[in-house]
Each structure stands twice: as structure tokens, then as C-alpha cells.
Design a protein with these regions (language model features):
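Membrane-interface transmembrane helices that cradle and orient dolichyl/undecaprenyl
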Residues: 13, 142-145, 183-205
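Transmembrane-helix signature of polytopic, membrane-embedded enzymes
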Residues: 25-32, 116, 137-159, 177-178, ...
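Membrane-proximal lumenal/periplasmic loop motifs of glycosylation machinery
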Residues: 45-51, 69-103, 123, 291-307, ...
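Short acidic/glycine- and proline-prone juxtamembrane loop motifs at membrane-interface regions
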Residues: 50-51, 162-175
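Transmembrane-lumen/periplasm boundary regions of multi-pass, lipid-linked membrane glycan transferases
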Residues: 56-59, 64-69, 94-97, 215, ...
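Transmembrane-helix motifs of polytopic, lipid-linked glycan transferases
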Residues: 121-144, 182, 186, 340-343
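Short helix- or helix-capping micro-motifs
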Residues: 153-158, 185, 213, 217
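Short periplasmic/luminal acceptor-recognition loop of GT-C membrane glycosyltransferases, typified by
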Residues: 439, 476-523
Length: 524
């Protein structure tokens, strides 16, 4: 056993995970899931059609028509090359997305969305995935830390307005985040079952991990970036304990991903390599203008000139000003505590001249949360990496930040409250719940425009200041208002149809035109 493996040993099961749970404790994850589903179903009604949703809905309708042909005319007609390309409009120059968002949206549309109308009916799939994620987050943290920490994890998850509002939309990045969380959960369960189970039951969680990883891989290429992180974590925490999960990652995951992409069935390797070539050699795709600190980056402002990349510090800066401060504090506490614990374990091993020394229970688990949270922000910070749309591209980091916040809370709870004063623990937990709900309620439905008190909130963050003449307007805000157009809902649309005398109306015509074409009722 290596030094790192000793330091990262998860130790015995948590004392907060009793072998016998009450009925309420058993159904608590389900109650959390249902509560999150109801809350999201209420909140989503206030969000208008956003920039990318018309395209996703159009692609969903193409799939519906393709399945109609499959059942009406049989496989020979549906799998004809031209018809397959029309029905599965993905991984191409005009639509670089992968099909998961449309498949999830379609499932929601034909189940819970059956009782709703577009565009909200297509959002139900994402709402269900969000609710399931909340239930898994609660269950996982409760089993490994404590019930109060589990509640704090869910409060942190729904208490980040940008995360919450983004997850309500028919959008890809929340699916990337949720399936990364679910796959990490299955990965951890696989590690535990390797110690506790024997025979065929040892394969349950590795297979589940492979399925979740494969499905998540068809959300977006950013999902793939967590795979090296899993490999590093597995090597550092004992590779012999993860051979089953590694096997399923190499076999089950590719098959699950391929199942969701019929155009690649006839030539899986060629289809995948062609998609990679498209991503790497697209001359236009990454020249997306970025507004950061009052200036425009990453855009070809003058034809033929090389776009200026977004500075690396956009990631830590935007993260620090778009996350509620109490979550930032708890995350810092957890990262600092985990780092010091790892350092102490290494020093103890060195002092013991190679003798095994027990690490802090949970080191491997917290390391998994930390590496999963760090991988995408670190990639986006690399020179030349696309960094458009604020924090959207590394949204999964904020999901794992909820776990880290729970870990930070648990450290403080054990240090200052302990297990003998549960009432005080629940008072502290309830206070954070109120804070999380209040933060979202006060800014709803403008969650995607949230800025915290470190920059004076939304008002100060978007206050025009003198910035010189690098752009036509010398006075402009340092930070941008939402670019999603989610606030242009039906109510605002009616207001726009009857503007006040002398008022000027500015809107994004493509979104309205596509909405009208699909009968989504977004324009006045």
C-alpha cells in the first residue's frame, strides 16, 4: 500500500450512518427529490425561452419524426443514411451538440411535460435530473458525513442562484454536472462494495458507473475531461481496488454512449474521430465574444487578427463574485482542512519511517470531490481555452462545491458543536437553509444575473464606470447582465408589445424568430 493510499484510506463507515434507519430516514432522499422537483417546477414558470433552447427543441422534434418513421416504415427507411442524418442532427458544423439534451428533453416532454406546453414541457427532463441529483447528494453526504451536513449540501446546491436557474432550463451543462455527480457516486459505491461484497454483486456499482459515464459522455465533450481525474484518483487511492470500475469504463461506458448515437453505429471509430476533428479544426466555433471586466475578448474584432484570449483570472474572479459568500467560506474551510490533513498524514508516515499510519476517515472521498470540482476550472484557465458565457463551461465545479461546503460545515460542526448537541447543529443547518432559499427568492427570476456582496450585488456589479475608449461606449459596467434572455418571458413579451411613449426596445431577433417558427409563443 502506498503512502498516498494510506493517507487517503476512507476508514470505517461513518458513525452517522446507522445500520437501522427509521422509516422517515429511509424515505428522506425521496422526500428531498420530490421537494426539489416541486420547487423547480414552480420556479421554471417565470423563465422565458433562452438563447439555445429553440435549437435543442428543434433537434428534439427531428428525433420524434425519426422515431415516427421507424415505427411507420421500418428500420430500412429510418436507418437510410440521409434520413438518419436528418433525424439525428448532431456532431456537425451547424449543430456541434451531442444528443443527450434532446433525449432527456423528449423524455420529459412525453411524460410530465405531457400536461404542460412548450417550451416548459421540454424542460421537465432537466428538472427530473436536477431533482434526482439533489436526492443523491443528500443520500451520499448523509451516509458519509452526517444528516446536518447532507442538508447543508442540498442547501448549497439550490442556494447558488446561477446554478439553480441554469439547471431549470433545457440546457446541456447542468446535465454534464448531474451525470458527473451521479457517476462519481457510483464510482465511490463501487469502491465500498469491493470491500463488503463478493461474487457477482461486486459488479453492480461498476456497471452502474459505466452506464452513467457513457450516458453523460453524450451530453458534451466537457464531460470527458473528468475521466483523467478519475484515473488519477483511482491510482492514488489504490488501483487494485478499482479494476472492476476501470473495466466498465473501458467497455460499458463506450457501448452506452454509442447506443445514444445511431449515426455512428455503422462506423463508431470513424464517427467519433470525425467529431474530434470537427471540434479541433473548426475555424469559427471558438471565436465567441466574451465580455469581461468591461472589455471584449475572444472575438475576431478585426478580420484576420488573432482574437485576444480571456485572462486566466476570469475563472477565480467570476467564481468568487457569483457564488454566495457563505458557500465560499465553507468550501475554503474544507479545502484547507483536507490539505492540512493530507500533509499531517504524510509527515506522520515520514516520522514513522515507513510504518503505516491511519489517515483521516473520508480523505479519499473528499479527494474525489475536490479533484472533480477542480478539473474543469483548471482546464478553462489554460491559455487559449475557450472561456465564453461566464461560469457556464465549468458549471459542474459548482455542483461539487456543494459537497465541499458540506465537508467544511461538518468540520466546523465537529470542532465547535460535536455530536452531543444535535439541537444546535439543526439550528445552524436551518439558518443556512433560510439563507439559501432567501438568496434565490430575492433575485428570482434573475438568478443568472446574480452577483454577491463582494462586488456590491447586481446593482454595483452592473453600474457603468469610466473605462476608456477601447469600445464605442466609454462608460460601461465591469460585469454583464445575463445573456440568456431568460427574463424575456410571456409577461415581458406582452409589455414589449405596448411600449411606453418614447421608449426604445432592444431584443435578440433570432431567438424571437425561432420561437415564432416553432409556435412557442415568446413574441408579442
Amino acid at each position: 500500500m502506498t503512502a498516498v493510499d494510506d493517507a487517503a484510506n476512507p476508514g470505517p463507515p461513518s458513525q452517522h450512518s446507522p445500520l437501522r434507519r427509521t422509516r422517515l430516514q429511509q424515505i428522506a432522499p425521496l422526500l428531498i427529490t420530490l421537494a426539489c422537483l416541486l420547487a423547480s417546477a414552480w420556479a421554471v414558470r417565470d423563465l422565458g425561452l433562452t438563447t439555445d433552447e429553440p435549437r435543442y427543441i428543434d433537434n428534439s422534434q427531428r428525433i420524434h419524426a425519426w422515431f415516427g418513421d421507424l415505427f411507420a416504415h421500418g428500420p430500412s427507411a429510418a436507418f437510410e443514411e440521409k434520413r438518419l442524418a436528418e433525424g439525428w442532427y448532431y456532431a456537425r458544423q451547424e449543430s456541434k451538440n451531442l444528443p443527450l439534451v434532446s433525449l432527456i428533453g423528449s423524455l420529459g416532454h412525453f411524460t410530465l411535460g405531457f400536461f404542460d406546453s412548450p417550451p416548459h414541457s421540454y424542460r421537465w427532463g432537466n428538472l427530473v435530473i436536477l431533482a434526482v441529483t439533489c436526492g443523491v447528494v443528500f443520500s451520499w453526504v448523509r451516509d458519509e458525513l452526517s444528516s446536518p451536513a447532507a442538508v447543508v449540501a442540498v442547501a448549497a446546491l439550490i442556494g447558488m442562484p446561477r446554478l439553480w436557474a441554469h439547471a431549470l432550463l433545457m440546457s446541456i451543462d447542468p446535465l454534464v454536472a448531474s451525470f458527473q455527480v451521479l457517476a462519481c457516486w457510483a464510482l465511490w459505491k463501487s469502491r465500498q462494495d469491493d470491500q463488503l461484497q463478493t461474487g457477482f454483486s461486486n459488479w453492480r456499482w461498476p456497471v452502474a458507473f459505466g452506464l452513467l459515464a457513457g450516458v453523460g459522455a453524450m451530453a458534451k465533450p466537457t464531460f470527458w475531461l473528468i475521466v483523467p481525474a478519475w484515473v488519477v484518483w483511482g491510482v492514488l487511492t489504490g488501483p487494485r481496488r478499482h479494476w472492476r470500475t476501470a473495466t466498465c469504463l473501458l467497455t460499458v461506458a463506450p457501448l452506452a454512449a454509442l447506443l445514444l448515437m445511431p449515426p455512428w453505429w455503422s462506423n463508431p471509430i470513424g464517427g467519433f474521430l470525425g467529431y474530434i476533428d470537427l471540434l479541433l479544426n473548426d475555424p469559427v466555433g471558438w471565436k465567441i465574444d466574451v465580455y469581461y471586466l468591461g472589455h471584449v475578448f475572444q472575438a475576431e474584432l478585426v478580420p484576420g487578427t488573432r482574437p485576444v484570449p480571456v485572462p486566466w483570472h476570469s475563472v477565480p474572479l467570476l467564481t468568487s463574485i457569483t457564488t454566495p459568500p457563505w458557500i465560499l467560506v465553507l468550501v475554503v474551510m474544507e479545502v484547507a482542512g483536507w490539505s492540512l490533513s493530507l500533509l499531517a498524514a504524510r509527515l506522520a508516515r515520514r516520522a514513522g519511517r515507513g510504518r503505516a499510519t491511519p489517515g483521516r476517515p473520508g480523505m479519499a472521498l473528499e479527494g474525489l470531490w475536490l479533484i472533480a470540482a477542480a478539473v474543469l476550472p483548471l482546464v478553462v484557465m489554460l491559455p487559449g481555452t475557450p472561456a465564453h458565457d461566464g461560469t457556464r463551461l465549468y458549471r459542474p465545479a459548482f455542483y461539487f462545491a456543494a459537497f465541499l461546503a458540506a465537508g467544511g460545515f461538518e468540520r466546523l460542526r465537529l470542532r465547535w458543536i460535536g455530536d452531543n448537541r444535535p439541537r444546535i447543529s439543526w439550528i445552524a443547518t436551518s439558518s443556512l437553509i433560510v439563507l439559501a432559499v432567501g438568496t434565490n427568492a430575492t433575485i428570482h427570476p434573475a438568478g443568472l444575473s446574480y452577483y454577491n456582496s463582494l462586488v456590491g450585488g447586481f446593482t454595483e456589479a452592473t453600474q457603468p464606470v469610466a473605462l476608456g475608449h477601447s469600445l464605442p461606449e466609454p462608460r460601461r459596467p465591469l460585469h454583464e447582465v445575463s445573456y440568456w434572455w431568460e427574463l424575456f418571458n410571456r409577461e415581458r413579451s406582452r409589455d414589449a408589445g405596448a411600449p411606453s411613449t418614447g421608449a426604445r426596445l432592444t431584443f435578440f431577433p433570432r431567438t424571437l424568430r425561432e420561437a415564432d417558427a416553432q409556435g412557442l409563443g415568446a413574441s408579442p
